[in-house]
């Protein structure tokens, strides 16, 4: 028997409308990160799939997430990207299969296309190309390797944020994320590099106000706790990922810091629930 939205709503303890809007990524919906995670987790556990609105073409696309299903629950950004890619592909009439980091060997040999989300090693990308010439990478610049890719304007966004913060604040911190490719190589985040260069250009760079942790809620929490415990004055903090910003906010609230009166906080990704 097919899983319905009502089944998910009953298990999550929320309304049918909330489930529908979360699973359809309604940008107008205001819901906590915890509720969103719970709904999506239940949908995954029940193997819920949306009915495509367009006529199915018979072609199959593998949506490959560089995280495991468990780790994805800690990063609402990559979860949102993956769900939106699935939705767009299904609406275009494609059949989709979701593949996580720990089961990439399940991608069939006759797959028609692959959308790879995240930071994959060159070796892994080569394996994808051996399966199909139709490979698109999301959120990782691999143009130099001859692959198509889609990613946000990290440089423009970070320069805009840096321009605002350096105009209004003196002591500016940065919480950046540690990312590794699927073979363990560190990826230097262009957001981190761009923001630090902007601070250096206007002589606001203070290495003691830069913290690098895992791109998770806990990572953001730990980094902000370290900044608050340090001897340096702090007026504003740039966080390069919304999941980390959730943790940073928790640390500020625990320290009874008034935002933005005492410390301003800016984060990147624009997840509506942050």
In which residue ranges do the predicted regions lie?
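Short beta-strand segments enriched in small/hydrophobic residues
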Residues: 20, 55-72, 171-181
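Short, glycine/serine-rich, charged loops/turns that create anion-binding
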Residues: 23, 27, 68, 103, ...
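Bacterial carbohydrate/catabolite-sensing allosteric modules
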Residues: 45, 49-50, 87-91, 130-134, ...
């Amino acid at each position: 028997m097919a899983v319905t939205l009502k089944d998910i709503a009953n298990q999550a303890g929320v309304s049918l409308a909330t489930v529908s809007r979360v699973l359809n990524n309604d940008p107008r919906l205001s819901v906590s990160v915890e509720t969103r995670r719970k709904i999506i987790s239940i949908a995954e556990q029940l193997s819920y799939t949306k009915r495509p609105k367009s006529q199915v073409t018979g072609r199959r696309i593998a949506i490959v997430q560089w995280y495991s299903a468990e780790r994805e629950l800690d990063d609402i950004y990559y979860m949102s990207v993956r769900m939106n890619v699935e939705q767009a592909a299904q609406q275009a009439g494609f059949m989709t299969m979701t593949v996580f980091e720990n089961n990439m060997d399940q991608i069939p040999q006759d797959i028609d296309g692959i959308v790879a989300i995240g930071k994959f090693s060159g070796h892994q990308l080569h394996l994808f190309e051996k399966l199909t010439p139709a490979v698109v990478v999301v959120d990782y610049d691999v143009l130099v390797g001859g692959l198509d890719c889609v990613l946000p304007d990290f440089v423009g966004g970070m320069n805009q944020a840096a321009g605002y913060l350096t105009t209004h604040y003196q002591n500016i911190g940065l919480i950046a994320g540690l990312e590794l490719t699927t073979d363990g190589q560190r990826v230097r985040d262009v957001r981190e590099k761009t923001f630090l260069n902007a601070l250096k250009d206007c002589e606001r760079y203070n290495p003691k106000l830069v913290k690098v942790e895992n791109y998770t809620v806990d990572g953001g929490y730990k980094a902000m706790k370290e900044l608050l415990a340090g001897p340096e004055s702090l007026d504003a903090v740039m966080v390069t990922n919304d999941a980390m910003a959730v943790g940073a906010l928790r640390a500020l609230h625990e320290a009874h810091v008034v935002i933005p009166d005492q410390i301003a906080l800016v984060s990147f990704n624009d997840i509506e629930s942050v």
